[in-house]
């Protein structure tokens, strides 16, 4: 095989891998409750090869005790046809939270986009202000591309995300009944696998 042909084949393979999407290297689960009622489990695939620092932050916070991470924290902001937001384990209202690296850490990169419903992204208050807060999209949110770091995708439990999305809200888009992460944890992935750059039904 000529050098030029080999280069062409390798380029096509690289483009094909890119089109297939990022590889899931870790999983995190959330056991969800609404108003004290169990509503199911959300399993999220995380992209540790693309955004390792962001993924490490999320995985560690999912394994910490209540009050120190995601266990016991709430989804405090829910907007239909947009997203559900949580991860503020210090104040519970969107003004708190912190990362494993300190209060805030920088935007790692914007290699991934908000391709549709079911993508996991870091909430922030502007450039390089990532802490522990995150959101899960319930629609395609292209206007957030390049502003929020995407680092995961829902693998199981999109029906639970939709149930949270549909829960009645009060002032400030806050659910009237508490939407709580009753339990959370890390699921190791022995063989990383790719996911499509598409929304979750």
Swiss-Prot record:
Q: What range does the record give for the signal peptide? A: 1-16
For this protein, the Enzyme Commission number is: 5.2.1.8
Give the source's domain of life in one word. Eukaryota
The cross-references to InterPro entries, in alphabetical order and at most eight, read: Cyclophilin-like_dom_sf (IPR029000), Cyclophilin-type_PPIase (IPR024936), Cyclophilin-type_PPIase_CS (IPR020892), Cyclophilin-type_PPIase_dom (IPR002130)
Q: What GO molecular functions are on record for this protein? A: cyclosporin A binding; peptidyl-prolyl cis-trans isomerase activity
Which residues does the record list as glycosylated? 130
- Looking at the keywords, is Isomerase present? yes
Residue stretches making up the PPIase cyclophilin-type domain: 29-186
Give the CC-aspect GO terms. cytoplasm; intracellular membrane-bounded organelle
Q: Name one GO biological process term.
A: protein folding
Q: Which reaction does it catalyse?
A: [protein]-peptidylproline (omega=180) = [protein]-peptidylproline (omega=0)
- Keyword vocabulary terms for this entry: Glycoprotein, Isomerase, Rotamase, Signal
Q: Into which family does the record put it?
A: Belongs to the cyclophilin-type PPIase family.
Q: Which PANTHER family match?
A: PEPTIDYL-PROLYL CIS-TRANS ISOMERASE (PTHR11071), PEPTIDYL-PROLYL CIS-TRANS ISOMERASE 6 (PTHR11071:SF293)
State the function annotated in the UniProt record: PPIases accelerate the folding of proteins. It catalyzes the cis-trans isomerization of proline imidic peptide bonds in oligopeptides.
What is this protein called in UniProt? Peptidyl-prolyl cis-trans isomerase 6
